[in-house]
Design a protein with these regions (language model features):
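A short glycine-rich beta-alpha junction/loop motif
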Residues: 98-106, 136-163
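Sequence-specific dsDNA recognition surfaces
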Residues: 13-29, 43-73
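Short coil/turn segments at secondary-structure boundaries
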Residues: 25-34, 133-135
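Short, solvent-exposed alpha-helical surface patches in well-structured domains
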Residues: 117-120, 130, 151, 161-165
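Non-catalytic DNA-recognition/assembly elements of restriction-modification systems
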Residues: 1-25, 158-200
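A short beta-sheet element
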Residues: 41-42, 67-123
Length: 200
């Protein structure tokens, strides 16, 4: 925290386009396969991105009653509870996504800040450490709230510099994906060699 404070005097609250809010609760009767909205639960963001296919569909009646709890492109959804999930984030990248976020998450909408840069920052050891030391409760009953998160430091660098860093991250991710593909190819070759030996 002190190291971040030396880097920036700005807080998340200084870059919010609107207050951070918690999501909506749901009951089994609210699910409806004929609905148009996905329910963004903690389980759907546990892999650091929104898993569209695993998200339940809620009824249109429910969705209409929770219109203030919807998401749009560039929103960041932060899990606020659960021992293994608290602090995990997902960036909403689909402009056409219709979604309602769960009450155990919070929605962060930023202005004058690159949302993807913020997303990667929220994934850093620094930010996750802040979640760890400021969360309340024990085990799966741990929680953190918007009033706390809004006061966390946020790196204050020009947007063009944020974009440069995001591009650098993308390049590194692409390298990693190529390495993974190469390892997979080698594994297949090894499997084939072993299978050939067995079949002789």
């Amino acid at each position: 925290m002190d190291e971040l404070k030396r880097t920036t005097t700005k807080r998340i609250k200084h870059f919010l386009s609107e207050p951070i809010i918690l999501g909506a609760s749901v009951s089994p009767s609210d699910y409806d396969e004929d609905g148009n909205y996905r329910y963004i639960s903690m389980a759907t963001i546990k892999s650091w991105k929104f898993d569209f296919d695993s998200a339940n569909i809620v009824s249109d009646v429910y969705s209409e009653s929770k219109s203030a709890k919807t998401v749009k492109k560039d929103d960041i959804i932060l899990a606020r509870s659960g021992e293994c999930t608290i602090g995990k984030v997902a960036l909403i990248e689909d402009e056409d996504l219709k979604g309602i976020f769960v009450d155990f998450t919070m929605r962060i909408r930023l202005k004058d800040y690159n949302p993807e840069f913020a997303y990667y920052y929220f994934r850093t050891t620094y930010f996750q450490y802040l979640i760890e030391i400021y969360k309340k409760g024990l085990g799966n009953n741990t929680n953190i709230f918007p009033i706390v998160v809004r006061e966390f430091p946020l790196i204050d660098i020009p947007v063009y510099e944020q974009e440069r860093i995001v591009a650098e991250i993308h390049a590194e991710i692409n390298k990693q994906e190529k390495l993974k593909a190469g390892i997979s190819d080698i594994q297949q070759q090894i499997d084939q060699i072993v299978e050939d030996c067995i079949s002789q």
